[in-house]
Amino acid sequence: MHTGVKTAVQQYIDGCAAADSRRVADAFDAGAVMWGYLGDEYVTMTGAEFATQVVGTATPAGPEYRSEIQRIEVTGKVASAVLVEEGFLGSNFRNELGLVERDGRWRIVSKVFTTL
């Protein structure tokens, strides 16, 4: 598993669990966008909006929160990761993350998600 990619995904996980909007925002590239479904509702926002509007207004996760990085694939300076979360804000999620290495650092540039 590529260390830099795993570090970026783990930063996202740790930030979500701690309700730390700055940590989550830093895991995303400045131009990151996300799309997906909360139940039947289609949602899209930037990574920065997710960090401030969702994570920034949440309380830290309790013991019910679990996460698993199920897959990481790296080709050159691009990567994809599958992250499954249980008990995040009362729901379970499957996240498909796109990452890019730029200036020596991996960041999330896209997130496609659905509730499970």
Predicted regions and their residues:
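Short beta-strand segments enriched in hydrophobic/aromatic residues
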Residues: 28-29, 85-87, 112-113
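Short beta-strand edge/turn micro-motifs at domain boundaries
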Residues: 94-116
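Residue-level detector of alpha-helical recognition elements and their boundaries
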Residues: 20, 27, 38-40, 47, ...
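Residue-level recognition of short loop/turn positions
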Residues: 31, 75, 103-105
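Surface-exposed, charged secondary-structure patches
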Residues: 4, 13, 33-38, 43-92
